[in-house]
C-alpha cells in the first residue's frame, strides 16, 4: 500500500515517475489482492517446491499414517483436558513384574558404580553377565522363546530404576528391548528366523544393535543414502537371490559388541527380480555383525 501511494504521488511530480511506478503498482496489487496473489505467486511457488521434493514411497506413507493419537494430542495443542487424563486407568504391574523390580533390578542397581563405568568406558564383566543371565535383554521377547514378556509399563519402570543408578547401564538394556530386532522379528520374521535369533537374544547370547543413523542424514530415515539392490550372487557355493548392500552408519549404540545388526536401508529392484516395482523405500535387514564386508570401527 505504501509503495502504491508513493508511486501515485511521484507520478504528479514527474511523468517518468508514472511510467516507472505503473509496474510497481501492478506488483503491489498482485501482492495485496488474495486471488491474484494465489494465482500468480502462491500456487506457482508451491508447485515448484512440490516438484523439487522427493516423492514418498508406499513404505514411508504407511509409516506416516500408522498409529493413532492419544491424550498427548490435546497436550501438544495447548488445551489439555485434565479430567479426561485423570479418568484413564493407571497401569499396574503383574506379580511377576513387581517381583523382578523388587529383586533382580535392586540387585543389579547395587552392583553399579557409574563413576567406575565412566572411567573404564565399559560395563564390568560381572555386570554384563548378571544382565544376560537374568533376562534384562529379553524383556520384550515372549516366554516361549525364553524371554520375560513384560508389559511396556514394566519395561519403563525397570529402565527408570536402572537409570536412577546408571544411565549407561540403562541405555545398554534399553536398546535390545526397543531398537533391537526382537519386536521386528515377532511381527515380520519367519519361523526359522524367530527360532534362530529370539532365544539367543533373550539369553544375551546375541547382542543386537540397530543401524539407522548415517553421517549425512542423521536419524532421518527418509534421507538415508544407504541402499540394497536386489540381485543374484554367490553365497556358500550357490547362486542365490539376495541384496548387494552399500551403507555407512555412525553413532550406533552397542555396535562395537553387537553380534547381529538390524540394518535400515532403501531397497531397489532395477532388474525387477521380485516384481514390477523398482523402488521399495525403507526396509530392514538382519545382518550378522561377522558377515563379510561389515566393518565396525573402534569406540
Placement of each model-derived feature along the sequence:
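Hydrophobic transmembrane alpha-helices
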Residues: 2-15
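Amphipathic, small/basic residue-rich leader segments at the start of a protein or domain
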Residues: 4-6, 21-176, 183, 188-207, ...
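Short beta-strand micro-motifs enriched in acidic
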Residues: 229-233, 267
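A gly/ser-rich beta-alpha-beta helix-loop segment of oxidoreductase catalytic cores
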Residues: 209-230
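Short Pro/Gly-enriched beta-strand edge/turn motifs at strand-loop
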Residues: 207-212, 244-245, 293-297
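Hydrophobic alpha-helical transmembrane segments
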Residues: 12-24
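A short core secondary-structure module
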Residues: 238-294
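Flexible loop/turn segments at secondary-structure boundaries
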Residues: 146-151, 178-182, 216-220, 251-254, ...
Amino acid at each position: 500500500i505504501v509503495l502504491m501511494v508513493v508511486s501515485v504521488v511521484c507520478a504528479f511530480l514527474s511523468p517518468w515517475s508514472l511510467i516507472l511506478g505503473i509496474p510497481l503498482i501492478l506488483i503491489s496489487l498482485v501482492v495485496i489482492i488474495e486471488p491474484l496473489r494465489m494465482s500468480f505467486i502462491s500456487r506457482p511457488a508451491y508447485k515448484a517446491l512440490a516438484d523439487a521434493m522427493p516423492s514418498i514411497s508406499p513404505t514411508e506413507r504407511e509409516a506416516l499414517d500408522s498409529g493413532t493419537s492419544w491424550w498427548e494430542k490435546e497436550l501438544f495443542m495447548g488445551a489439555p483436558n485434565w479430567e479426561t487424563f485423570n479418568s484413564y486407568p493407571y497401569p499396574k504391574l503383574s506379580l511377576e513384574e513387581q517381583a523382578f523390580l523388587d529383586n533382580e533390578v535392586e540387585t543389579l542397581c547395587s552392583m553399579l558404580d557409574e563413576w567406575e563405568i565412566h572411567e573404564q568406558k565399559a560395563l564390568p564383566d560381572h555386570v554384563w553377565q548378571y544382565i544376560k543371565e537374568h533376562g534384562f535383554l529379553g524383556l520384550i521377547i515372549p516366554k516361549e522363546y525364553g524371554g520375560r514378556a513384560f508389559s511396556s509399563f514394566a519395561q519403563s519402570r525397570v529402565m527408570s530404576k536402572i537409570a536412577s543408578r546408571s544411565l549407561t547401564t540403562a541405555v545398554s538394556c534399553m536398546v535390545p528391548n526397543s531398537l533391537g530386532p526382537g519386536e521386528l522379528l515377532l511381527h515380520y520374521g519367519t519361523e526359522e528366523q524367530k527360532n534362530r535369533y529370539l532365544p539367543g537374544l533373550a539369553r544375551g547370547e546375541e547382542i543386537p544393535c540397530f543401524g539407522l543413523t548415517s553421517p549425512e542424514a542423521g536419524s532421518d530415515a527418509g534421507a538415508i543414502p544407504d541402499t540394497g539392490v536386489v540381485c543374484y550372487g554367490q553365497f556358500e557355493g550357490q547362486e542365490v537371490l539376495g541384496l548387494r548392500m552399500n551403507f555407512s552408519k555412525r553413532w550406533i549404540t552397542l555396535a562395537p559388541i553387537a553380534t547381529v545388526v538390524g540394518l535400515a536401508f532403501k531397497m531397489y529392484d532395477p532388474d525387477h527380480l521380485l516384481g514390477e516395482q523398482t523402488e521399495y523405500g525403507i526396509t530392514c535387514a538382519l545382518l550378522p555383525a561377522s558377515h563379510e564386508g561389515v566393518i565396525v570401527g573402534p569406540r
